[in-house]
Amino acid sequence: MVITRTREELYKTLKEFSKLPGKLALVPTMGNLHDGHLSLIKLAKLKASKTIATIFVNPLQFGKNEDFKKYPRTEELDIEKLKKEHCDILFIPRNIEEVFSKIEKLKTLDSGSLGSELCGKIRPGHFDGVLTVVNRLFELINPDVAVFGAKDYQQQFLIKKMAISLHP
């Protein structure tokens, strides 16, 4: 497994992997991987011949009363788990600037009225942050396929809607 921590390393690795035949599947995560995440890696491997996982604790999806700093970070364990699943590439940005450059204007996506309902009522701005980072990962990686968990139907619906709209 190739581990990348900078945008430059990511682009270089993706360029090398693009020379190989087959599709690339993306599995975005925030780390602290469990069996559900690993099942997504397995599913990605069924859908594509090359897999990339990301571990990025996205500060944009945490609200004022949610503690971004306390989110569990288990990087070494996560790396070992992904190696066992034969994930090809892992992108663990060393800092937020590797995802959202200071030079680029941050394009925050609006989840609309659906993002303000259900879970969005108690976590205002959460889905805007999720959509913004997933869109950015799509821009950086340009996967053929992306695999997401199904535990949060609202999030899954919003991501699918965004992907169809911005990445047809």
Residue ranges of predicted features:
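Nucleotidyltransferase catalytic core that binds NTPs
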Residues: 1-168
